[in-house]
């Protein structure tokens, strides 16, 4: 097992991406992927999977604060299922509540408003999702 994981923060216009290592329980952002109504360029995802050869892909599951599902929840689950179906990689859905809030706060702390562009926030959210998964799983 490689100990490498990819994390995705699913969105309809942008999908945040992060790569992390189980041994250090840390992740770092990769460039966010553009999406059209939630549909990414699958060739780019294939390249990411070939480059990083992750043990599993962690996809953030957007839930309401009370734990109930919202309209985006089913779309994120569908995105995860498509990754598994197309590429055969193991998928884990991970609760992403407050990941965007935490990501925005961290980016603002390090770069003010200039750091809060959409792609940066989405990939920083993917980092939060992945590191949260590591904390809860290992």
From Swiss-Prot:
Could be a nuclease involved in processing of the 5'-end of pre-16S rRNA. CDD domains: YqgF (cd16964). It comes from Klebsiella pneumoniae (strain 342). It is an enzyme of class 3 (hydrolase). GO terms for biological process: rRNA 5'-end processing. SUPFAM superfamilies: Ribonuclease H-like. GO terms for cellular component: cytosol. Its EC number is 3.1.-.-. This is Putative pre-16S rRNA nuclease. It is found in: Cytoplasm.
């Amino acid at each position: 097992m490689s100990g490498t994981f990819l994390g995705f923060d699913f969105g309809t216009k942008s999908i945040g991406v992060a790569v992390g290592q189980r041994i250090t329980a840390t992740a770092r952002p990769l460039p966010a992927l553009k999406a059209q109504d939630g549909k990414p360029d699958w060739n780019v995802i294939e390249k990411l999977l070939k480059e990083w050869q992750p043990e599993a892909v962690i996809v953030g599951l957007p839930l309401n604060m009370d734990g109930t599902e919202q309209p985006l929840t089913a779309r994120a689950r569908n995105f995860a299922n498509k990754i598994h179906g197309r590429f055969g990689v193991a998928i884990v859905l991970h609760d992403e509540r407050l990941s965007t809030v935490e990501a925005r706060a961290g980016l603002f702390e390090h770069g003010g408003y200039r750091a809060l562009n959409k792609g940066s926030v989405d990939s920083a959210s993917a980092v939060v999702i992945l590191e949260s998964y590591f904390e809860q799983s290992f």
